[in-house]
Regions:
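Amphipathic terminal alpha-helices
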Residues: 2-6, 311-332
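N-terminal Rossmann NAD(P)H-binding glycine-rich loop of SDR-like oxidoreductase domains
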Residues: 3-34
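SDR active-site strand-loop-helix element
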Residues: 18, 42, 70-71, 111-117, ...
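Adenosine-cofactor binding site in Rossmann-like domains, unifying the SAM/SAH pocket
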Residues: 33-57
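NAD(P)H-binding glycine-rich loop region in Rossmannoid oxidoreductase-like domains
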Residues: 52-93
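Catalytic helix-loop patch of NAD(P)-dependent Rossmann-fold dehydrogenases
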Residues: 90-95, 119-179, 183
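NAD(P)-dependent short-chain dehydrogenase/reductase
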Residues: 153-213, 219-220, 227
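Mid/C-terminal beta-alpha module of Rossmann-like enzyme folds, strongest
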Residues: 224, 231-284, 326-331
Length: 332
């Protein structure tokens, strides 16, 4: 996808992107390398997202019209430590709230915020719609609670700004897009790379098979976020995942078989990748068993944008990711 311009943007104001060094942040850098508009990528050394004063200083300095928040506290298990609670909530809830309060009062302002399947707590066995109830909060891990609080803070900030605006300024309303996703992989440490490494080192693997979700490409997530920036679709929560579903075990088998078929030095056989229940691999933070997210709302939005690209299946994206990873490994 090409992003040479965005119709409604004031090109004297930069697009501000938090989370430069994460998987989605790196993908955004690739997507925007040829953009004919100012873009500022911020990492931890540029802005302390646990500090209100640091965030406020950055917003006042750059005065962006668009913010893409690809940053998050993602140490899911570490967040269960009482000493980490405040940091998780500062980065995942308070920081997005500050961004939202700022952008909500900018003419044609846009906030893209990436969220997670962890806001759901196994209240159904089919794919969640955006309208489904989240939580209950006491059934979520701390990471999930902090991300849910961030979502709610964004919605509240934009609702307050909308209520305070005169009707004649409706055409200048700012918008927000909360993109919930799951099982992200890209340029960086992730489940797929871990499985490929272990498959090259071991002749037996055990992988959780009773947690189901949708593997999602960071590159595709970056492209979807930018599609929303360039669109006229309405504010709201959108489930940004490809088609299909699988378990962690299913993903591991598919990725390993794909790598083996393309010449990677993997000897492990599929029958030696053993499915296990999550109870056999206990972790401090509770993970959802059902991470399925219904993507029909996003598909409708893309259709309204006259988006002509083919909506992907997770297998297609994972296959290409593994092929690219194998080829880069062979070159190095």
């Amino acid at each position: 996808m090409a992003y040479s311009s965005f119709e409604l943007l004031d090109h004297s104001r930069p697009i501000l992107i938090f989370g430069r060094d994460g998987q989605v942040g790196k993908a955004l850098q690739t997507c925007l390398k040829d953009l004919k508009a100012p873009v500022v990528f911020l990492g931890r050394s540029d802005c302390d997202l646990s500090s209100e004063s640091s965030i406020t200083e950055v917003l006042n300095r750059y005065q962006p019209q668009v913010i893409i928040n690809a940053a998050a506290y993602t140490a899911v298990d570490k967040a269960e430590d009482i000493a980490e609670h405040d940091l998780a909530f500062a980065i995942n809830a308070k920081a997005p709230a500050l961004m939202a309060r700022y952008i909500a009062n900018v003419s044609h302002g846009i906030l893209v915020h990436y969220s997670t399947d962890y806001v759901f707590a196994d209240t159904k066995q089919t794919a969640y719609f955006e309208s489904d109830s989240t939580g209950p909060v006491d059934s979520l891990c701390v990471y999930g609670q902090s991300k849910l609080t961030g979502e709610q803070a964004i919605e509240e900030a934009f609702n307050l700004a909308s209520d305070s605006c005169h009707a004649s300024y409706q055409d200048k309303f700012s918008r927000y897009f909360i993109l919930r996703t799951s099982w992200v992989y890209g340029d960086g440490g992730n489940f797929i790379r871990t499985m490929l490494r272990l498959a090259a080192e071991r002749d037996q693997l055990k992988v959780v098979a009773d947690q189901v979700g949708v593997p999602t490409s960071a590159q595709w997530l970056a492209e979807i976020g930018l599609q929303m920036v360039g669109s006229r679709v309405g504010s709201g929560i959108y489930h940004a995942v490809p088609d299909g579903e699988t378990s962690w075990h299913g993903l591991a088998v598919f990725a390993i078989e794909t790598a083996a078929s393309y010449g990677e030095g993997i000897e492990i056989r599929s029958e030696n990748i053993h499915p296990i229940p999550a109870t056999e691999y206990p972790l401090p933070a509770k993970r959802p068993y059902n991470s399925r997210l219904n993507n029909q709302k996003l598909k409708k939005a893309l259709s309204d944008m006259a988006f002509t690209g083919q909506y992907p299946h997770w297998r297609t994206q994972v296959e290409q990711y593994v092929i690219d990873f194998v080829e880069s490994s062979l070159k190095s």
